[in-house]
Amino acid sequence: MAKQIKGVLGKKLGMTQVFDADNRMVPVTVVEAGPCVVTRVRTPEKDGYSAVQLGFGQIDPRKVNKPLGDYLRKHEITPRRYFTEIRTDDASEYTIGQEVLADTFEAGQFVDVTGKSKGKGFAGVMKRHGFGGLGASHGT
């Protein structure tokens, strides 16, 4: 059996709360994890290190640049919005086009998450620090 990758790409859907065994309310994050597809396999013989590149999320094929689009068409992979490379011990166990699902993790397992925040651009102090401002009437 192939050794599973301990990582998948996902999207935060929101927050909710659950009760633990002691009836305490615990905040939890809901994440749509996968399905990811293997888009590239790096081997020590060819690339000098062992890794697997994963793709996640759908994107309109017209928005993909020409070199990446040609590579994905050549390997019959639908275009993906996000790509990341995950190092692994033996990348030769994976094939291009193979799906990696969220069953990599067990229920209740703690995971490390790396995120990318939404950019808000250059903002003034009211938006940046959440100031409410004063009443908008005459004299103030």
Swiss-Prot record:
Disulfide bonds: none
One biological process term in Gene Ontology: translation
Chain segments annotated as coiled-coil in the UniProt record: none
Superkingdom of origin: Bacteria
Entry GO CC: cytosolic large ribosomal subunit
Keyword vocabulary terms for this entry: Ribonucleoprotein, Ribosomal protein, RNA-binding, rRNA-binding
Binding partners and assembly: Part of the 50S ribosomal subunit. Forms a cluster with proteins L14 and L19.
Entry function: One of the primary rRNA binding proteins, it binds directly near the 3'-end of the 23S rRNA, where it nucleates assembly of the 50S subunit.
Family, per entry: Belongs to the universal ribosomal protein uL3 family.
PANTHER family tied to this protein: 50S RIBOSOMAL PROTEIN L3 (PTHR11229), LARGE RIBOSOMAL SUBUNIT PROTEIN UL3C (PTHR11229:SF16)
Name of the featured protein: Large ribosomal subunit protein uL3
Species lineage: Bacteria, Bacillati, Actinomycetota, Actinomycetes, Streptosporangiales
